[in-house]
Amino acid sequence: MIRSSVDRIMLHVCLALLPTTAWGLYLFGWPAIYLWLLTCASAVACEAACLYLLGRPLRRLLDGSALLSGWLLALTLPPWAPWWIAVGGSMFAIGIGKQLYGGVGQNVFNPAMLARVALLIAFPLQMTTWALPLPLGTEGAPGWLEGLRITFAGGALADGLSGATALGHLQTELTLGHSAAQILDGHFALLPAFLGYSGGSLGETSELLILLGGLWLLALRIIHWEIPLGMLLTVGALAALANQIDPQVHGGGLFHLTSGGLLLGALFIATDPVTSPISRSGRLIFAIGCGALVFVIRSWGNFPEAVAFAVLLMNALVPLIDRVCRPRAYGRNARGKPLVAAKWTRQVKEVDKV
């Protein structure tokens, strides 16, 4: 039974994530399944522990917010990451990113992205080691027992089982003096990237399934169109412009739109109603800022993927954006002060005419 609007939102977002999650679990096999289960279970367990220690009712677990935070974090992790990445990241997301601010609806930053950035800074090797797709049941794919060993015993991936993402490969090869066109010609194909046959984080492989889930949320009016559309258009426009100016260094707009976690971030992460602006104009400003930061960090930053950094930086500006874009109260000026009598009378007459 859905108990509140919060429960309803969390349920529908989880349902929208199911297609891309199921595809990622199939594509990367048993280690990815264990990672996803561990991350979600750890997030819920940490939420329960925090509620108990703070003397809050445990029924708040039923709102699904902890499960969703763990789920989103899992989708942004390398699919064969060790167990302690899953557990530690979930504990950080819930304990620091959520409960430290007062619980659901009070957090300033997106908990999943805060945890991902913390993991990336603390454990850069584990967070940038990517397994190649080995679908369940295919030759060479680890069975359930081998998957347990990979997840819980750890160990470096063999060269034949690991590879760089398209964004990471571009960044590395550019430092060696190769042009972007040469690099992407043999390492990036648009259709496989869109359909979901390329490596990367657990939940970012199939742009098609992410898009379908996001469109469903838009149809239900659970998310607003301004953030995903504004963010994607900004990244695409800046990337296309940069590619026209200097094609030797910059990939094109379609490459940036279908690579990494941009689509997942635009539809499922940046649209978090708690950490995004409340007004339409504010959401557009937020989206453009996120998109611009994604492109800038991808192009000149130390990390090839930039969605988490961009979202967190713009989360910090949300209070300012809300203040600047706050609708003017009736009978008051833009600063919130009462209008003088003449202006007030004119405003009333204009309303009466309507």
Swiss-Prot record:
Q: Does the keyword Transport apply?
A: yes
Q: What class of enzyme is it?
A: translocase
Xref: Pfam families: NQR2_RnfD_RnfE
Cellular component aspect of the GO annotation: plasma membrane
GO biological process assignments: electron transport chain; transmembrane transport
Keyword Lyase set for record: no
How does this chain assemble? The complex is composed of six subunits: RnfA, RnfB, RnfC, RnfD, RnfE and RnfG.
Q: What is this protein called?
A: Ion-translocating oxidoreductase complex subunit D
Q: Source gene?
A: rnfD
